[in-house]
């Protein structure tokens, strides 16, 4: 039976019912709805709506229902209830009879669903934070094991300067740390309870909403009933965090897809995260990474869709707001799955050090070192930049790396160049000179690993 049927003389058209009902997706709020109902029953005792004995009977029935839902959640979808609130109330009435009809006193589905969704978001943020930190730890461990793996760093997908695989890993640790911070920051604004705000104007019962918030594990209660039932900022914030986080994971995936190509050959992915071709027996495709990259778009779409849903809504609750859940559920599920999958990819990755080093020695990635050498000899940087550009052109013409050009050739471009230039052009020198904070020098990378390990403990 609908929770609102008394006003109507005709039954809802079945087509409208199918269009209107939300149980097929808000069933995921079942546990939160039951937990919120237990807390509400306690609040009703404080204002004399329920006796202590009635409340105990309701709480016992709700706890039995909670265990039943955890054991067999699929039972919810076997119902034709309008939404999860109707389903829980119907099951409660089945268990305790008329007493179950007293529970909704002073409560609206508007503050009820807002509370349920916030509780679900809090639970899910906790899962996301755990998965995020697990991936950070996997990256730090991979970095620690590959501090000596020299590889080319890229700009414009052109070899630019030597870096290490460890330094590359730590770049993504920084991105994930910002994702973690965004989630923690969003959690602060999320951690306020709307329960007790009624449909929009507040409840007519003098319930201690701060006490009620505490029972539910919220830091405090909201301050304005009209805003409380209308607010979906937390949905937008979490979708935004997910969208940014998925961009980071997509870039991570794209890098590794490139590193795994036959043309680059820097890494070998585990058989556990790759697949083959139905036609070409030799293929080993990076499907896990491609799916991470591909799933980024659906999360961006969820954020955009929710922005458009909310932008024109008047206060307070409107049925449009039912659209907040499917996109949110899908986006956060996707982000969580991709965090886990990225960690699994790292678990079996093999870095091909000889190939990485060979690539780092190609493409004149040490050209900047020669320019810095000239600057140290008193040549203005802009002039040094031009000199080195000419030297690179000559090296390309001869098919040699810069360090293989004889001194007489190098001195054609600048007389200040001496024998001491050759150690400067080595890969090790290129790395060691980047010793400022955040640089790629072995010392800085080791410090960054130690800092990340300490932060993640």
Swiss-Prot record:
PROSITE patterns recorded: FUMARATE_LYASES
Biological process according to GO: arginine biosynthetic process via ornithine; L-arginine biosynthetic process
Main location: cytoplasm
Localization per record: Cytoplasm
InterPro entries xref list: Arg_succ_lyase_C, Argininosuccinate_lyase, Fumarase/histidase_N, Fumarate_lyase_CS, Fumarate_lyase_fam, Fumarate_lyase_N, L-Aspartase-like
Keywords: Amino-acid biosynthesis, Arginine biosynthesis, Cytoplasm, Lyase
Zinc in keyword set: no
EC number: 4.3.2.1
Lineage: superkingdom: Bacteria
Single GO MF annotation: argininosuccinate lyase activity
One Pfam family linked to the record: Lyase_1
Gene Ontology CC annotations of this record: cytosol
Catalytic activity annotation: 2-(N(omega)-L-arginino)succinate = fumarate + L-arginine
Pathway(s) the chain acts in: Amino-acid biosynthesis; L-arginine biosynthesis; L-arginine from L-ornithine and carbamoyl phosphate: step 3/3
CDD domains: Argininosuccinate_lyase
Database matches in PANTHER family: ARGININOSUCCINATE LYASE
Family affiliation: Belongs to the lyase 1 family. Argininosuccinate lyase subfamily.
Protein name, UniProt field: Argininosuccinate lyase
Organism, scientific name: Shigella flexneri
Organism ancestry: Bacteria, Pseudomonadati, Pseudomonadota, Gammaproteobacteria, Enterobacterales
